[in-house]
Swiss-Prot record:
Keywords: Cytoplasm. It comes from the Eukaryota. Its main location: cytoplasm. This is Uncharacterized protein YEL014C. The keyword Cytoplasm applies. One of its GO terms (cellular component) is cytoplasm. It is found in: Cytoplasm.
Length: 101
C-alpha cells in the first residue's frame, strides 16, 4: 500500500489554497496535504468530485511537480502521516495525511 501510494503522489495532486489542504483520491482514499507556503494561485472547483463531503466551491488549486523522490518519504504509521523531506523546494514541503473514504 505504501509503495503504490508514494508512486501515485507523482501525478495529479492539487492544493486547495483557501484552507491549506491538498486533496486527491486514489483507490478509495482521500489524501489531505498541509503545506507551509504557496506562491501560486489557480481557481478550480472540486464539488463534482466529492459530493456531500464538504463545500468544495471556489477553491484555489496548484498542481504539484512529479520529480519528488519518493524514497525520501518518512512514514508515521500510527498517525497515517507522510512527511516530505526538507530538501524539497519550499512550496512543496508537505505533511500528507490519508483518509479512508
Amino acid at each position: 500500500m505504501t509503495a503504490l501510494f508514494c508512486l501515485e503522489l507523482r501525478t495529479n495532486i492539487f492544493l486547495i489554497m483557501n484552507d491549506c489542504i491538498i486533496i486527491n483520491y486514489w483507490k478509495g482514499f482521500i489524501f489531505s496535504f498541509h503545506s507551509y507556503f504557496f506562491p501560486f494561485r489557480f481557481e478550480s472547483s472540486l464539488r463534482a468530485h466529492y459530493p456531500g463531503k464538504r463545500n468544495y466551491s471556489d477553491f484555489s488549486v496548484i498542481p504539484l511537480p512529479y520529480y519528488i523522490d519518493v524514497r525520501s518519504f518518512h512514514i508515521c504509521e500510527s498517525q497515517h502521516i507522510i512527511a516530505l523531506p526538507l530538501q524539497i523546494p519550499l512550496p512543496y514541503r508537505m505533511l500528507i495525511r490519508m483518509y479512508p473514504v
